Amino acid sequence: MKRIGILTSGGDAPGMNAAVRAVAGKAMAEGLEAYGINYGFAGLVAGDIHKIEAADLDGVIQRGGTLLYSARYPEFAHEEGQLKGIEQLKRFGIDALVVIGGDGSYHGALRLTEHGYNTIGLPGTIDNDIPYTDFTIGFDTAVNTNVQALDRIYDTAHSHDRTFVVEVMGRGAGDVALWSGVSIGATAIVVPEVDWDMEEIANKIKHNRANGHRSNLIVLAEGVMGAQEFVEKLSEYGDFDARGNTIAHMQRGGNPTAKDRVMASKMGAYAVELLLAGKGGLAVGIQNNQLVNHNILDLFESKHDVEVSLDKLNEEISFK
């Protein structure tokens, strides 16, 4: 093996650049060449590929986004797209690949391995919805971004005795909402994995107001419903002077936290070690602070465990 390709795919996540840097840096340290593939699988098929030089990696570990850019390319699910991608890999003499992204990206990684190109997947998504890893690259930064925004929303909510419903990302998973909500002492956290009742939430707001609490923040996972829809349904149970707010794509940008930088660096270097050992079709993760790898097929047959106990914790320590 002489050349390793690297691509980022799907939604960007803070820390992707740290992962790219780690893969390329480890490859160079092992006497290999690293090639960057722009715009994910779309760029692979189009041949948008370049050699990564050491100077290209200066200052990237602290940058958000992805220096390799990203795109969604559903056409890669079909064999025609996969074969076009393989043609480009052969053209550039790339022997193996590291794919950084979410579960859709892992499907592409598995297909390439089946076609004879060892490929390793790294979990790059703020949603934290990948099985067999405690945390995904970008999750910690997204939660910290939310906490900063929610703290600011709390200030204005407190000034006006208002209720705010703040929608956060996570796709179908509630991790982002749960961690963000506990971190700011939310009145309620609403996620897909936990049963909830609108009337109970309304009664809690009324109870809080009656006991001198001037503001209420509800953290809402986007997989449940939108913030404005939630506000409208909440208004059926009383006049709460509620406002809907969506933090949106701010969660996917910004300088990655130290945790995301270190985790991405560990995973990236480990991916190269696996490729040097002749392995492919694997997904890298961190469990109990240890690097692990699992067959990508196992991920498709499993479901990420959301820490739903955080919702109970938030209920127990909230003021009654």
Swiss-Prot record:
Binding positions for Mg(2+) per the UniProt entry: D103
Molecular function, one GO term: identical protein binding
Positions bound to ATP: G11, R72, Y73, G102, D103, G104, S105
Enzyme class of the recorded protein, top EC level: transferase
PROSITE patterns for the chain: PHOSPHOFRUCTOKINASE
Cofactor requirements of the protein: Mg(2+)
GO terms of biological process kind: canonical glycolysis; fructose 1,6-bisphosphate metabolic process; fructose 6-phosphate metabolic process
Record pathway: Carbohydrate degradation; glycolysis; D-glyceraldehyde 3-phosphate and glycerone phosphate from D-glucose: step 3/4
EC assignment: 2.7.1.11
Positions that bind substrate: T125, I126, D127, R162, M169, G170, R171, E222, R243, H249, M250, Q251, R252
Locations listed in the record: Cytoplasm
Function text: Catalyzes the phosphorylation of D-fructose 6-phosphate to fructose 1,6-bisphosphate by ATP, the first committing step of glycolysis.
The protein's name: ATP-dependent 6-phosphofructokinase
